[in-house]
Amino acid sequence: MTCTIVVGGQWGDEGKGKIISYLCKKDNPSIIARGGVGPNAGHTVEVDGEKYGIRMVPTGFPNVNAKLAVGAGVLTDPEVLIKEIKMLEKFNVGERILVDYRCGIIEEVHKELDKSNEHLSKEIGSTGTGCGPANVDRAMRTLKQGKDVESISKYLGDVSEAVNEALESGDNVLIEGTQGSLLSLFYGSYPYVTSKDTNAASFAADVGIGPTKIDEVVAVFKSYPTRVGEGPFPTEMSLQEAENLGVVEYGTVTGRRRRVGYFDHELAKKVCRLNGATQIAITCLDKYDSDCYGITDYEKLSEKGKAFIKEVEEKVGVKVTLISTGPKLEQTIDVRNE
């Protein structure tokens, strides 16, 4: 039995979707549970050459043997949830998903408030998905819960009970975190942050398990960190420099161009300490050095690629166990058992 939490080590967009999908296929967890804020964070999952952009359904959906869960701590937009369940019909998501009946519900009024609030939309760079205003209502105890919404009633249940029972039965459980540690309401670059905490301890609470149940925390870092929206970015490079390096990306939810920077070892060390990270996953190593593209054996990485990994391990103090060298699941180096 292993309970693994995957967290973003930067400002989101680290490539958690790819790492989560790989772990779900490799480790075959019985439950893949989603923690985090809500539908304000997007993940892109590629299956057999087809890309799926999702915001509510856990990114481990390609593993058709696993139950998919959305924890009580996750804000749920029924419209987005139902749309994604239909989009992923061939993966039988509708029969496998369990949404906690205590989850908070995002309504149209929350989205309208999010988009019309000048402070949120212009100064902070909110995604406009209604999460901030919904969390305000939750704090005021006026927010609807999943049990109050008929359209999703057939998907509702007790996620905490399901996850704890799976762990007690000796099954593997994977908990997906969203966004990134540096967007945490408590530990990020306030006020340019999201509307709740985005670290491992909070993700565990989101799905209803205690801290002693957690075995592994995988912190995901992109070789070139990116950020959408406003806020400090200590190692940010110019847009022209990013273009020269071939690093041009756009946000899954907002469509806005991502700001790009160089790897920040000091911030990475703080993030790993904050999350109690037991291992690191590095994504987009092929963007750092194109000679690393598609490599699946660590020893066959270029010297430049190996030097990057070694520097991360030495300066951050946590072992790099997973390395993504391309968008496909098989384009992954896994040294967890070495």
Swiss-Prot record:
Catalytic activity line of the entry: IMP + L-aspartate + GTP = N(6)-(1,2-dicarboxyethyl)-AMP + GDP + phosphate + 2 H(+)
InterPro entries: Adenylosuccin_syn_GTP-bd, Adenylosuccinate_synth_dom1, Adenylosuccinate_synth_dom3, Adenylosuccinate_synthetase, P-loop_NTPase
Disulfide bonds listed in the record: none
Record-listed GTP binding positions: 12-18, 42-44, 258, 284-286, 324-326
Binding sites annotated in the UniProt record for Mg(2+): D13, G42
CDD domains documented for this protein: AdSS
Enzyme class: ligase
Annotated pathway: Purine metabolism; AMP biosynthesis via de novo pathway; AMP from IMP: step 1/2
Record keywords: Cytoplasm, GTP-binding, Ligase, Magnesium, Metal-binding, Nucleotide-binding, Purine biosynthesis
Residues that hold substrate according to the record: T252, V253, T254, G255, R256, R257, R258
GO molecular function: adenylosuccinate synthase activity; GTP binding; magnesium ion binding
Enzyme Commission identifier(s): 6.3.4.4
One Gene Ontology term, aspect cellular component: cytoplasm
A biological process from GO: 'de novo' AMP biosynthetic process
PANTHER family reported for this sequence: ADENYLOSUCCINATE SYNTHETASE
Family assignment from sequence similarity: Belongs to the adenylosuccinate synthetase family.
HAMAP family according to UniProt: Adenylosucc_synth
Its biological purpose: Plays an important role in the de novo pathway of purine nucleotide biosynthesis. Catalyzes the first committed step in the biosynthesis of AMP from IMP.
Protein name per Swiss-Prot or TrEMBL: Adenylosuccinate synthetase
Native source species: Methanococcus maripaludis (strain DSM 14266 / JCM 13030 / NBRC 101832 / S2 / LL)
